[in-house]
């Protein structure tokens, strides 16, 4: 029996769904190029054969450096079908980091988006990079193959031997390495995690257990393809379920695309959901008193009903009647901004604030939160019929979870990675006796739903010995319209302070006073030793370019503190304040 690999999942779907649409790539001219499932499979076969023709063998690393687009998917599946190790690189990193990651992957070939990107990488990395096999997904350049030319080479191989592809793919085993994931570096130095075909297919097979999606549904891909959430949930699981994927042309065009495509499934990081919320509340703030009262009254009613349903309690008929009115007058218009057809709205890649989750539940579009990581795959998800706000859900089939004595979440699962590429010491630190030590501090409720309360490495211990988890407190600011980001400070210090960035759309003459009120509101929900005593508003937002954010917009706490060390010092001069 042939090994079950990522390619065999595509092969099964091509047989099942045939000419049905699989991928929709924008042409830049207001139209889309559509690939059917059979065309998707054919492209993967041709690319695999083409890679062999240019000397790329089983076990060789092939890097992918591109924004998320259909050609990335084709190249990825072709590389995997060839038995190559596919290493996706973040395009948003500084050039020097991109070059370092490319070299660390030991790639022999690079699929790259366009000539400009290729020239920039070679310029940053020097002549040695020019010796790699460069394959352009779009455009043409001297010293590089185009994707079309590679596919032509593959077709020639198939013309010469009709079973050329079958011979190539027969070499691939389920236990063979399939992908290298670059960790985000949010909690340490970036590393590359090696994941096998068996681990990926195990994760793919979990999809139908939690997502009731069919070929009549659709989704939009816009997250970085180097991120595990995008790779598993929006690239690989759709293959198993026959789900068509539409690709966003750019983040700037995403709001328009949402209304035009009207997806039924959307995965986005909390930052996207926060921005939608902030834009709605900023707009409401500018309206008259009656409109504001209607909006906040409707949200309050929706939140009350959502809470009753979450707790399994009956909802009075009178409230259900009012909710229908609120939905028609208020909530349906908010959902229309996102196309109006979303059945499953998922949040991933970073923790979601409980208050933000309650807002979306109130408007009839509950955010389903899950949990995954480079080293473990996607292992938890909220049941669609009974999600719990603030929880990452329950374990997926085949996954075991337990807590260490200090509350660290441990995972045993067929989806676990094999280890960090070329770093056995780092691997041994996180994989012990078949269990993955995640570094996340967690709790279980009575129904075995999981709640992440913080990162082990981010724990703040004050000079008085009090333990504070900053992530839990920072999440409380997510529904404050004036606040963009908050980073807490206080490790080995006498009290807690914060660096704050504000929402540009909400800035007024009274911004500092508004921030002070927001801090006071959050402080009322905290123990005295957790309360923020001083804060400083930064003149700019955190950025990927300055190393303060990961590509999925998670804050790199240590880099933020390093970049603003003078301000941090000022926060601990003079007398302690209260907010």
Question: What is the predicted role of each segment?
Answer:
Residues 93, 110-112, 403-405, 413, ...:
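AMP-binding/adenylate-forming catalytic core of the ANL superfamily
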Residues 485-488, 494, 521-579:
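Conserved C-terminal "lid"/linker of ANL adenylate-forming enzymes
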Residues 18-21, 152-182, 189, 212-218:
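Conserved pre-ATP/AMP-binding loop-to-beta segment of ANL
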Residues 266, 306, 326-450, 456-459, ...:
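Conserved AMP-binding/adenylate-forming
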Residues 34-38, 178-204:
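Conserved AMP-binding A3 loop
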Residues 201-218, 225-331, 341:
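Conserved AMP-binding/adenylation subdomain of ANL enzymes
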Residues 2, 19, 23-73, 77, ...:
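Conserved AMP-binding/adenylate-forming core of the ANL superfamily
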Residues 29, 116-174, 280-333:
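ANL superfamily adenylate-forming
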């Amino acid at each position: 029996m042939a090994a079950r690999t990522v390619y065999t999942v595509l092969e099964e779907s091509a047989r099942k769904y045939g000419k049905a649409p699989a991928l929709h790539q924008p042409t830049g001219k207001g139209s889309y190029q559509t690939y059917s499932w059979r065309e998707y499979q054919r492209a993967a076969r041709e690319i695999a054969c083409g890679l062999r023709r240019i000397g790329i063998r089983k076990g060789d690393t092939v890097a992918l450096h591109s924004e998320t687009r259909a050609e990335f998917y084709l190249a990825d599946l072709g590389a995997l079908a060839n038995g190559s190790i596919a290493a996706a690189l973040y395009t948003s990193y500084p050039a020097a980091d991109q070059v370092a990651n490319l070299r660390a992957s030991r790639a022999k070939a690079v699929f790259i988006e366009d000539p400009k990107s290729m020239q920039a990488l070679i310029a940053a990395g020097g002549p040695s990079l020019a010796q790699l096999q460069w394959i352009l997904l779009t455009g043409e350049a001297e010293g590089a193959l185009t994707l079309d030319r590679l596919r032509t080479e593959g077709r020639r191989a198939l013309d010469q031997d009709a079973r050329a592809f079958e011979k190539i793919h027969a070499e691939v085993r389920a236990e063979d390495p399939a992908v290298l994931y670059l960790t985000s570096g949010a909690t340490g130095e970036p590393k590359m995690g090696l994941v096998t075909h068996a681990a990926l297919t195990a994760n793919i097979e979990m999809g139908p257990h939690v997502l009731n999606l069919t070929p009549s549904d659709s989704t939009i891909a816009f997250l970085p393809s180097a991120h595990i959430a995008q790779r598993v949930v929006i690239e690989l699981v759709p293959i198993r379920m026959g789900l068509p994927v539409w690709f966003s042309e750019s983040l700037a065009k995403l709001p328009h695309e949402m209304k035009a495509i009207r997806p039924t499934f959307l995965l986005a990081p909390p930052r996207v959901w926060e921005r939608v919320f902030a834009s709605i509340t900023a707009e409401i703030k500018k309206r008259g008193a009656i409109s504001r009262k209607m909006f906040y009254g409707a949200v309050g009613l929706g939140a009350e009903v959502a809470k009753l349903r979450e707790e399994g309690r009956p909802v009075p008929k009178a409230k259900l009647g009012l909710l229908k009115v609120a939905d028609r007058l208020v909530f349906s218009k908010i959902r229309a901004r996102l196309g109006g057809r979303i059945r499953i709205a998922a949040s991933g890649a970073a923790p979601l604030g409980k208050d933000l989750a309650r807002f979306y539940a109130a408007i009839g579009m509950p955010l389903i939160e899950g949990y995954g990581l480079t080293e473990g795959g996607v292992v938890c998800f909220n049941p669609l019929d009974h999600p719990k706000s603030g929880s990452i859900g329950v374990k997926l089939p085949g996954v075991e979870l337990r807590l260490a004595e200090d509350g660290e979440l441990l995972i045993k699962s067929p989806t676990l990675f094999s280890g960090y590429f070329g770093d056995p010491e780092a691997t041994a630190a996180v994989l012990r006796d078949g269990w993955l030590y995640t570094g996340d501090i967690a709790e279980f409720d009575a129904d075995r739903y999981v709640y992440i309360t913080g990162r082990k490495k981010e724990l703040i211990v004050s000079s008085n010995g009090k333990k504070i988890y900053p992530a839990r407190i920072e999440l409380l600011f997510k529904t404050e319209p004036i606040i963009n980001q908050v980073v807490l400070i206080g490790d080995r210090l006498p009290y807690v302070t914060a660096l704050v960035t504000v929402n540009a759309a909400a800035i007024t003459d009274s911004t500092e006073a508004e921030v002070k009120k927001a801090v006071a509101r959050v402080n009322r929900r905290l123990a005295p030793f957790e309360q923020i005593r001083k804060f400083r508003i930064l003149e700019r937002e955190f950025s990927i370019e300055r190393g303060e954010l990961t590509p999925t917009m998670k804050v790199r706490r240590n880099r933020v503190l390093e970049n603003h060390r003078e301000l941090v010092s000022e926060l601990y001069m003079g007398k302690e304040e209260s907010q």
